[in-house]
Structure formats: structure tokens, C-alpha cells
From Swiss-Prot:
Keywords: Amino-acid biosynthesis, Arginine biosynthesis, ATP-binding, Cytoplasm, Kinase, Nucleotide-binding, Transferase. InterPro entries: AceGlu_kinase-like_sf (IPR036393), AcgluKinase_fam (IPR004662), ArgB (IPR037528), Asp/Glu/Uridylate_kinase (IPR001048), NAGK-C (IPR041727). This is Acetylglutamate kinase. GO terms for cellular component: cytoplasm. It comes from Bradyrhizobium diazoefficiens (strain JCM 10833 / BCRC 13528 / IAM 13628 / NBRC 14792 / USDA 110). Belongs to the acetylglutamate kinase family. ArgB subfamily.
Length: 295
């Protein structure tokens, strides 16, 4: 039984219809974060929402993270994790675990939930069919003792350089739902771990997606009084980074949004992935949810 009256159900559908028409046959890239995955019921609700998108003539492409799951496995195996510039330092032993968790465990679990909900999902990583080529990430940090910048070696961590859409376009054409683990291959054939937000931005940009949704563990971009900012232009987003309003882990997320917009994505939204049906609320309601960043 539902507590929603028939009249309210009709109003909900009436509100959703123009949004469904707006996204008809469009591609939506959804980055599903490790923290946003939540518990099993939340994950299954997410899967049902993805299937609903496909059934309403939208082309969903899911990119997932897996930071918490990787950390759990590394701890179980007694491998210490180190971070620099917000990125995991990934040595040869760690990249094997990262690939096992992302491509072998997390990816297949999401695929299973989507298929259980009636969809036809296909699990892949950026390594498959050389979909995503990347170069090793270079970062610098300031040494606190000398105040001198120095380069740091992050190991097998990469930044996307090229996305080959051949396989993705075929899957979308067959009405299959791609679920992508953020792994890529270097020109030397090495496996590289790519930040999931960055990976999703590169894929969305290559696909010229209508929307990129970044599901996170926060409601969106917050102002200095911790209130949600519903919309931001790229110009305003850069100002908020400069004045410190956008800080910490939100900076690379917003930078990913800006990059995706520059590559041709129409709009990027940072939303709270722990909220039930966050994807549907963003796409199919007038108010939406989270922070929309646009040109």
C-alpha cells in the first residue's frame, strides 16, 4: 500500500513528464561514489532508478568509485595506505588490490543489482577495448620544513587522456547499461587507478552527455553558512574556489564539473547519493536536488 493519494500520484507524473521528454534519447552519466553506495537497500534503490531511466528512453552510463571498499580490503590484507594531494599512493601491490576490488567486486555487485531490477547491465573498466588511455598523475606538494615545492610519485595513478567511444556507443545502441570501473591503461600497458570523479568527467565529456551527476556524501556545494547553493555558473564556481568557500575535497569535484562542461556536457549536478531516489529527484522534478553547475 502507498500513502500517496491517486491525485498526488497524478500530479507527480504530470510534473515528471516534461522532464522525461527533455531527456528522451539523451545520455546521462552518473558517478556513483563509494560512500554514496550506502547499505544494500540504498544500493538496490539506486539500481531500480537506473533501470527506470533506461525504460524511459534515457541512456544511463554508470561510473563507480570504491574508496571505502578498497580501504577495507587493504586493511584486511595488512597493507598500509598513504595519501598525497588527496590521492591514494598506489604501488604495484596496491594496484592489484584496487583492480580486484573495483573491477571484480564492486563493479559486479552493481551490475547484479541493476540486472536483478530488470535492466541489462554490462560491467567494464576503462581497460576494456582500450576505452580509456591515461598518463601517470604528477602532483607537487609544499615541504613544510623548507617551504619548497617538490614532486611526489603517486605510483600507478593516472589522469585520463583519451576516451575511445567505440564500445560504449555499441552498448548504448543495444540498450545495454554500461557500468564502468575507473581503471585505465597507460601507453606502456600499465594499469592505472583513476579518480572516479575525474574518470566520469572524461567519459561524460567524450559522450557529450546531457547531464553528469556526481553522487557524493554531501548535499552539494555549500556556502560559508553551510547552506546549499542550488545553481552556480563556472565563473561563480571559480570565484568560490578562490575565496575559500569551496575547499578541501569539493575542489576537485567542482574542477571535474568545469572540465566536463568545457568538453560539451550541458550541465553537471553534485548531489547527495545517500538520499533515496536522488537521481530521479534531480532529473524528473521541477526543484531538482543538489547543486547544478552550468556555463
Amino acid at each position: 500500500m502507498t500513502d500517496i493519494s491517486p491525485l498526488d500520484q497524478a500530479r507527480i507524473l504530470s510534473e515528471a513528464l516534461p522532464h522525461m521528454q527533455q531527456y528522451d534519447e539523451e545520455t546521462i552519466v552518473i558517478k556513483y561514489g563509494g560512500h554514496a553506495m550506502g547499505d544494500e537497500e540504498t544500493a538496490k534503490n539506486f539500481a531500480r532508478d537506473i533501470v527506470l531511466l533506461e525504460q524511459t528512453a534515457i541512456n544511463p552510463v554508470v561510473v563507480h568509485g570504491g574508496g571505502p571498499q578498497i580501504a577495507t580490503m587493504l586493511k584486511r590484507l595488512g597493507i598500509q595506505s598513504e595519501f598525497a594531494a588527496g590521492l591514494r599512493i598506489t604501488d604495484a601491490a596496491t594496484i592489484e588490490i584496487v583492480e580486484m576490488v573495483l573491477a571484480g567486486s564492486v563493479n559486479k555487485q552493481i551490475v547484479g543489482y541493476i540486472n536483478e531490477a530488470g535492466g541489462k547491465a554490462v560491467g567494464l573498466s576503462g581497460k576494456d577495448a582500450n576505452m580509456v588511455k591515461a598518463s601517470k598523475t604528477t602532483r607537487t606538494i609544499v615541504d613544510p620544513g623548507s617551504n619548497i615545492e617538490k614532486a611526489i610519485d603517486l605510483g600507478f595513478v593516472g589522469d585520463p587522456e583519451k576516451v575511445d567511444l567505440t564500445l560504449l556507443n555499441q552498448l548504448i545502441g543495444y540498450e545495454l547499461i554500461p557500468v564502468l570501473a575507473p581503471l585505465a591503461t597507460s601507453k606502456e600497458g600499465q594499469t592505472l587507478n583513476v579518480n572516479a570523479d575525474t574518470f566520469a568527467g572524461a567519459v561524460a565529456g567524450a559522450l557529450k552527455a546531457k547531464r553528469l551527476l556526481l553522487l557524493t556524501d554531501v548535499p552539494g556545494v555549500l556556502d560559508k553558512s553551510k547552506k546549499l547553493i542550488p545553481q552556480l555558473s563556472v565563473k561563480d564556481a571559480r570565484k568560490l574556489i578562490a575565496d575559500g568557500t569551496i575547499s578541501g575535497g569539493m575542489i576537485p569535484k567542482v574542477e571535474t564539473c568545469i572540465y566536463a562542461l568545457e568538453q560539451g556536457v550541458e550541465g553537471v549536478v553534485i548531489i547527495d547519493g545517500k538520499m533515496q531516489h536522488a537521481v530521479l529527484l534531480e532529473l524528473f522534478t521541477n526543484q531538482g536536488t543538489g547543486t547544478l553547475i552550468h556555463k
